[in-house]
Amino acid sequence: MTLDLDAHKKDDKLLITTIQQEYKILAEYKMIESEKLSGIYVIPSYANSLQWFGVFFGRQGLYAESVFRFTILLPDRFPDDKSLPTIIFQQDVIHPHVCPYTHSLDVSHAFPEWRCGEDHLWQLLKYLQVIFSDPLDSIRGIEVDKLKNREAAELLMNNKEEYVARVQENIKESKEHIFDTPPTEDPNYIVFEKFQQDVHGPVLDRIKAGRSKQTEPSAQQGNGGHATGLSWVKEGEFKPLSIE
């Protein structure tokens, strides 16, 4: 009997912890929405709130016109864990802060450790935006041997023409694969489709006319006024399903 009570208490504690974590992750998502970061789009996986899908659009500088997909992996105890979230690009991206082997972005120069309540995912994404906007400035004051891609750093500082050529190769590759079949069946994976007049034409016309389908009454009534896109959030409410 005692063992059963202990097991129930343990299950209840785990459920409470999960609910609290999901609220915190949802708050992070809402903060990102409110920041309106230009050229960066992210959304949590439909099945796992600790995995996020993202796309970075270069708007200026050496990486202008780039379209780089990436994944964010959150630590199991996020955001209470001091471990840093991991950003991994899905393709080769030449940059002093991106590992050429794992394609992971080194954020430790800006975030030595994760401080719960002080550090937020929107800041992490803002950092990504800044270092791609000015890669040379992003490595000032950092020893070359402490960078993830030493070769990229040396090219950037000593042979910018070659660095730019390598970047352009990355950009070309990213565009060639933008319409590829998704590597996952997760419905929240960000998918791009080629323009189809019969499908996208009416939407484009509404945008040009200053109207959006999302503002039409019928669209709002169909989903309660909100479309979260998150399976672990109750439809029509910002409430994790775990609470039920």
Swiss-Prot record:
This is Protein crossbronx. SMART domains: UBCc. GO terms for biological process: defense response to bacterium; sperm individualization. It holds the Pfam family UQ_con. Gene3D superfamilies: Ubiquitin Conjugating Enzyme (3.10.110.10). SUPFAM superfamilies: UBC-like. Residues 209-244 are annotated as: Disordered. Residues 20-176 form the UBC core domain. Belongs to the ubiquitin-conjugating enzyme family. FTS subfamily. InterPro entries: Ub_conjugating_enzyme, UBQ-conjugat_E2_core, UBQ-conjugating_enzyme/RWD.
